[in-house]
UniProtKB/Swiss-Prot annotation:
Subunit architecture: Forms a conjugate with atg5.
PANTHER family the UniProt entry points to: AUTOPHAGY PROTEIN 12, UBIQUITIN-LIKE PROTEIN ATG12
Gene name per UniProt: atg12
Localization (cell): Preautophagosomal structure membrane
Pfam families: APG12 (PF04110)
GO BP terms in the entry: autophagosome assembly; autophagosome maturation; autophagy of mitochondrion; glycophagy; piecemeal microautophagy of the nucleus; protein transport
Protein name in UniProt: Ubiquitin-like protein ATG12
Gene3D superfamilies given in the database record: Phosphatidylinositol 3-kinase Catalytic Subunit, Chain A, domain 1
Covalent crosslink: Glycyl lysine isopeptide (Gly-Lys) (interchain with K-97 in ATG5): G120
Keywords tagged on the record: Autophagy, Isopeptide bond, Membrane, Protein transport, Transport, Ubl conjugation pathway
Taxonomic source organism: Sclerotinia sclerotiorum (strain ATCC 18683 / 1980 / Ss-1) (White mold)
Function: Ubiquitin-like protein involved in cytoplasm to vacuole transport (Cvt), autophagy vesicles formation, mitophagy, and nucleophagy. Conjugation with atg5 through a ubiquitin-like conjugating system involving also atg7 as an E1-like activating enzyme and atg10 as an E2-like conjugating enzyme, is essential for its function. The atg12-atg5 conjugate functions as an E3-like enzyme which is required for lipidation of atg8 and atg8 association to the vesicle membranes.
Molecular function terms, GO-annotated: protein tag activity
Amino acid sequence: MTSSLLLTNLPHDSSSALEHAFSFPTAKITVRFQPIGSAPILQRPVSKISSSQQRFETVVAYLRRVLKLDRKGGEGDSVFLYVNSCFAPALDEVVGNLHRCFKDSKDQLIVTYSMTPAFG
């Protein structure tokens, strides 16, 4: 703001909007995992994860661990994750943002997974 000749501070409504832009209404969100194709089915397809600090890479690591894809000394097999069977989010995307934008009517983030690329 110091470089602006006309605007010395933000208007009140802009300041209050920015305060709430990065806050999440719930501390934990529900993630439902659904397999695509021949991917193995999870025993517990629903998990809770922190909404504010966790990135999507945490969801990928959790699913790899549950599916036992991480092997000693190697990368292991691939797993491909999609939100709402539409797109693969970036690994640095905050899970709370994905939940806020793409949750279903049951307030769950649907993450589908496959062992081979499923879309595009």
